[in-house]
Amino acid sequence: MVAVDSTFPSHGSSYSSRRKKVSALEPNYFGSMCMGVYSDDVSISAREVAQDYSCDSCGDLATVSSACCNFDELCGLDSALEMGCRSNEDCRAGQEASGSGIASGLDKSVPGYTMYASGWMYGNQQGQMCGPYTQQQLYDGLSTNFLPEDLLVYPIINGYTANSVPLKYFKQFPDHVATGFAYLQNGIISVAPSVTSFPPSSSNATVHQDEIQTEHATSATHLISHQTMPPQTSSNGSVLDQLTLNHEESNMLASFLSLGNEHACWFLVDGEGRNHGPHSILELFSWQQHGYVSDAALIRDGENKLRPITLASLIGVWRVKCGDANCDEPVTGVNFISEVSEELSVHLQSGIMKIARRALLDEIISSVISDFLKAKKSDEHLKSYPPTSAVESISSRVINAEKSVVSNTESAGCKNTMNEGGHSSIAAESSKYTKSVGSIENFQTSCSAVCRTLHHHCMQIMWNAVFYDTVATHSSCWRKNKIWFRSSDISTVNYCKGSHTKYSDKPESFESFTCRVDSSSSKTAYSDEFDLATNGARVRGLSSDTYGTESVIASISEHVENELFLSLKTHLTDYTSILIKDGANNTTSSARDGKMHEGSFREQYNLEGSSKKKNGLNVVPAKLRFSNDFSDSQRLLQEGESSEQITSEDIIANIFSTALETSDIPVNDELDALAIHEPPPPGCESNINMPCLRYKYQPVRSKESIPEIKAYVSMALCRQKLHNDVMRDWKSLFLKCYLNEFLASLKGSHQVSRKETLALKKRKTVTRNKKLVQSNISNQTAEKLRKPCVGASEKVLVKRSKKLSDSHSMKEVLKVDTPSIDLSVRKPSQQKMRNTDRRDHCIIKDATKLHKEKVGKDAFSKVICDKSQDLEMEDEFDDALLITRLRRISRNKTKELRECRNAAKSCEEISVTAEESEETVDCKDHEESLSNKPSQKVKKAHTSKLKRKNLSDARDEGTKSCNGAVKSFTEISGKEGDTESLGLAISDKVSHQNLSKRRKSKIALFLFPGFENTSRKCFTKLLSPEDAAKNGQDMSNPTGNPPRLAEGKKFVEKSACSISQKGRKSSQSSILKRKHQLDEKISNVPSRRRLSLSSTDSEDAVIKEDYDVRNEEKLPCHTSDKLQKGPNKLIRRRKPLAKHTTERSPIKDLSVDDGRPKPIALKPLEKLSSKPSKKKLFLSIPKSDGCARTSINGWHWHAWSLKASAEERARVRGSSCVHMQHFGSKSSLTQNVLSARTNRAKLRNLLAAADGADVLKMSQLKARKKHLRFQQSKIHDWGLVALEPIEAEDFVIEYVGELIRSSISEIRERQYEKMGIGSSYLFRLDDGYVLDATKRGGIARFINHSCEPNCYTKIISVEGKKKIFIYAKRHIDAGEEISYNYKFPLEDDKIPCNCGAPNVYCFCEQVPWIAKLKRRTWFSRRN
């Protein structure tokens, strides 16, 4: 603990100033108190008065307050420890060794004279007395083991040192610390002046100390001689010379005491007769117990009814009256309060002192830096010396500066006993170098001045503030073993005065020395007075030898520099980076300029090696370091003068570089020969090499001191941080790239797969058509060989077939897609018939396309010729007769075919019906082939004219061969596009032997095209079971069952008659029924025919049945193929047929009335609409479309209501009950089930019809409300989340609030906006009323806005009151947030959108041009 450079009076005054309390006493007597010595402004009379009552300098009545002041607690001592006794033989021995006299006349038996210790001192290793210290400082040193327990301390009582006691008594007898342990000694307390505490060292005291001690002696003598001794008391506490109290006074005294222990009615009377108070009896008793007031003190009552009595008498009467038990209990409470208050004050004082020290240190450092900057400015105008001379002069100055600084510090910190001459020379030398700060000549001298100034100020006050925090964990054991229990053994190395040219002679600039740590001047003492005297003699011998004294001071200074570095290293870490940077720059510049002297490094290395061998340490001399530092600084200063770029930061770094680099000097700690088991403090181990900071940076905290778990935790945190950074960068870098590649590859694969599929289908179709063409050619060749004699008409047909087979268009016409059919498995007869059916179908479609090209009558005739030609090629000779008859029938109907519209409809219906018999027909390619070759169409039309004549001839021949079997053939009206347009009649007398099975199939095909399989199976049923089994194997066998063939003929005749009967109707009625008949023929199939329908036909029938009839009029011939190619698209757009939908046969009754068959009763099926109906939208109304706020200007609503129609007004006022914008939901397009809302509506209607009551009540609405939860929203702030699944169109919650008028809503809106609430909870019902849910509303007001909401609002009138209900717009899953659309036209620019949905309605108020662009884009998409 470093001593503070102050005398007794100043120290006591500063300490008493913080303990002073407010009192009613006059300031001239008690205004300035101290611990041990009175101030000069206090008179002798006042001191005598104070001694009468407190008997010491601190017993002033001014220090007494209403809260009892325990002096033991003031010093921070533990009063709970037990007291003990010890002999004071050591104290007597110390008293004899000190040689101080014993003053008489101060007997302990005198009760009025109480002794108090105002300060404490102890002797150091050099025999010097250090102090005075307060009791708290000694107690802190003892508790932290900084001071040993056996250290002898001397109390200062009334300005004089008393007998010494061990420091451990502070813990053993805490109650006697305030009295200086005077009452523990049986002898007389010796109060002697401390003029010379130790005779050997008295000659070295300063003149100032002699004057102070002389003054103290005079004051003590005056106090002893003029002391007024109070009257003595006996052992029972009664006053000897005091009169006994009479009965009246006793009663009056008892009455005063009966007022209470806390009643303040007693005054203390001083020597001059003045009263001080009032005080309570408890306060007086407490002061008496702690010795603050003597028993002989006079006490006077407040009313002055009693004469003054002594305190002992008053306490005795009080004890008798209230009893010991009752008195001790309140005293304990008061004592506890006083202890707590004093403890708090002590802690507060220590905190204030620490802050004051730090503030003082900051002020010192700032003043030093400012002085240095001023010196630097003045130094810039001076011319620097050469580096060689500067090194020599500065090296010598540094040594002298170190000596002067250390000596000056020792003289200021302690009461040094050296002679006056040595002190004055050191002071003169110190003042000489202090002047150099004001008149600095170069940069190096300023550095030495700064270091000296730092030493001078920091050595006094920085130990507790800096060093103690750094070495507190290891200082206890180390100082106990190395400082307090060993003798000083200062080993020094004399400076060599040899030549400076030889480094082997150890010149002064390279001298190194070692020192012992126990040479510190501020922390040494001995266990007894004999050691102190011996050390005093040793120090006196060292002071006689000047050279030895200088070496001791130099060693101490060097050690202090090392400790200063250890403390600065922890507090000046900010400058380490600057130093490292400067060192690196210096080394780099030196290497670049070639100024590194190789010999100097070699010599330095040799020197370090030799010193290491001697001391076992890597020691670098301090003077050498100073020289190098100053030379580098000189070089930097010269560069700075030329460039003028030296900043204050670089200067400060260079200032501390010298102090920091002195840490390279290690401390050679030689431990005791005794067995010491305590570990040495860090940095003081033996044989440790300390590298220079110039080449290597030393961290403040070593790596070994870091716990292993902290290292693992740090590594884990670093890895986690690195992982997060890498993952974030990876996602942003690769995710987008991979997504683009995936989309590009997906798109490309779709395109490639589509192209490959189309190419594969086209390739298969071409191959199949080639095979069909080849087979047809072979069949035609065989027919020619079998029928050499053919009529003219047959020759024309053969020529036509050749042209069709040779032309390229035949390949396109015959492109047929037949999936799931293997042609190789069929028999030749089956294959031939299949090909014939396909060609027939393609020819009919060809006729339809030609009619679209306005070929007209010729084109249709051509189609008939082509069909007849193909039939004649493939059938046998007897089939030609049937074909001729068919041509004759078509010839009779050429007049009706001239009507283009009817013919077009006929062809379209033929094509639609023919598609059902085929698996897949590629009409698109056929259409392209026809459009690419118009010349072929013209040729075909020309050929059809030539064939028409032949048809007439063939008709005459066919009529004759029929033998008049059919007298009146029914005519086929041109309105039908089915097989009726190619109407035929078969004679009942046609021999069934001449009809082959193939011909029967042909007849069925012409009668019911599209039902090829059905007709074939129907005829198969008419045959015998054996023939039915052979139907798929041998179709050329003419045998059959005659009865069943007859039945088949009758069925064909009846069908033909019924069809011809319809032809007799007018063309007008046929046109009206055309649409219904088309749908009926596709969908309504007789039961016997529906059994034979294939899966493909059924699918096509369903598609065509659901197709819109209105589009059927404009449907081209190739549209059915498109529908057949993409059935999935149509199925997705249309609802499937209901399960309960039934099909009815179109033929109700075939009976004949009046010789004429009745028309077929047709009943169309009820079909679902293929397209959803479009609802009417009202967009011109300035309403809040579900928005939870109102318009700023209500006149918009008023202006609109004046112009609006009655219908719109009624709708807004709630007559329509709902907002039209939210009618329906998307789920209605994909679901065919009744929603829960519909079921409830039906139930309400039933109940209302049954009971006649209004069932729509609020209780039902509350029961229907869904379970929602109020929680944090992902959209904005707070929101509502569904806790259960909610179906579409279900009621969710009601928007509840306060119903106000529009004018009031505008006022509230402005108020809400000023308050920061906003107007998002105002919901407009109509142009007159607004629903305000800001302060009085339900949780529905927290539903957030979304541009893609899942709910919508409805305004419904319930019992004449409009209410706002929120319904689900779509299916809402559990956990999904409820939202609806706030937006409406008037306030798009006022409400910001936070939903973040990728919707064009999500406008942004900060960027208006983006909103316009989005709106324009959206409207363009709609158009």
Curated annotation (Swiss-Prot):
Entry protein name: Histone-lysine N-methyltransferase ATXR7
Region of interest (Disordered), residue spans: 923-960, 1057-1097, 1115-1158
Region forming the signal peptide: none
Chain ranges of the SET domain: 1266-1383
GO biological process, one term: regulation of flower development
UniProt keyword list: Chromatin regulator, Flowering, Methyltransferase, Nucleus, S-adenosyl-L-methionine, Transcription, Transcription regulation, Transferase
Disruption phenotype: Early flowering. Reduced seed dormancy and increased germination rate of freshly harvested seeds.
GO cellular component terms, semicolon-separated: cytoplasm; nucleus; Set1C/COMPASS complex
Tissues with expression: Expressed in the shoot and root apices, vascular tissues and mesophyll cells of rosette leaves.
Stretches assigned to the GYF domain: 263-312
UniProt keyword Nucleus present: yes
Compositionally biased residues, Basic residues: 936-949
Compartment(s): Nucleus
First-tier enzyme category under EC: transferase
